[in-house]
Amino acid sequence: MPVAADAHDDASGDGARNVPVAADAHDDAAGDGARNVPVAADADDEAAATGGRDWTAVAHRRHPTRVCEAVGWMAAVTRSQLAQDLRDLGLRPGGVLMIHARMSALGWVVGAAETVVHALRDALGPEGTLVAYASWEEHVYQAAEWPAEHVAAHQAEPPAFDPALSEAVRDHGRVPERLRTWPGAHRSAHPEASVVALGPRAHELTRDHPERDGYGRDSPFARVVAADGQVLLLGAPLETLTLLHHAEAIAAVAGKRTVTFTVEVAGAGPRTYTDIDTTAGAYRYADLGLPEDTDPFEVIARAALAAGVGTTGRVAAAECHLFDAAALTAFAVAWIEERFA
C-alpha cells in the first residue's frame, strides 16, 4: 500500500536473521559511522577554543569511524560517483533491486542516506524499482525474552502496526526508513516481514503480503525472484541477505522452526501471523558443526560466491556483493535441502 503521497516522484532519483548491518545497534542514531553532521562545539569546546584545542583529536573522539587515522576525514563520496560505481558493478537498468546498505562502509557520503537512494535510482533508471527489507521496530514475536514488566505494559497498550506509519527496524540501517518515507513508496502489510518498494513495480511487489508464510512462495521476496531481480549488499555483511529466509521457507525440508504471534493492526484489529523463525533460525544449523560465532547465512553466501553465483566489487570505499535473486535462491535451497532434507 502507498506510504507517501507521490507529489513528485523524482524519476532520476535486511537482513537476514535479524542481524544488524549498522556499526552499532542503531545506524540512524549513532551507528553508521559516516553521519554527515558537523563536529559541533559544546560549552567545553567553546571555552577551550582559544587554548589551542586539537580539533582533529576532537573529531577522532566523537566520530572515530569516519575519521582516517593519518589524514583526518574519510574521503567524500558524491551521488554521481555512487551511481557510476553501481553501474560498473552490474546493476541492471530498469530492473528490480533489493538493497541492504551499511552507510559507514561507503565513506563520508555527501547528503547521507538520501544521496544513496538517489544514486541507486540513478543507476536503475526511471523504469527500475528499488526494494528494501523494512520489518518493524517492534519485535513483537520476541516478547518471550522481555522482562515481565515490559510484557505487561505492552499487553496493556499494544502498539498497532500501520504500514503507512510504523518505523522500519533500525538495526538494518538508515536506508530502509529513508526509502519508506520517500514520496511514492509502497510498503507491504506484514509487521515482521514487510518490505518497502519505490518505482513502477512497487505496488505489484508489495501487495497482499500473506499473514501465513510471509517469506514464502506468495511473498514479496518470491516476487523479487520472479521479476528477475537482483540483490545488492552495499557494504553490508553477507549474513544480512534477507532473501535467504525465502530460500529457507520454500526448501522441501520437514520440521522447520516456526513462530506464531498476534499483532494489533491499525484498522483491522488483532491479526495472527505464522512464519519461519528468523531469529533462532528455521533449521538446526548448529548441528552442521559450523565454526563458533559463524552465521549460517554468511556460510551460504560465501559458498554461492565461490560457485560463481554473484559478483564482488567496490562502490566508493565499500566492498559490495551483487547477486541474481533467482540464482541465489536456487543455490541456497539446494544447499539447505542437501543438509537437512
Describe each PLM feature range:
Residues 1-48:
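Long, intrinsically disordered low-complexity tandem-repeat regions enriched in serine/threonine/proline
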Residues 60-63:
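Low-complexity, intrinsically disordered or signal/transmembrane-proximal segments
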Residues 56-58:
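Arg/Lys-rich, positively charged N-terminal/basic patches that mediate binding to nucleic acids
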Residues 66-341:
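N-terminal and secondary-structure boundary signal
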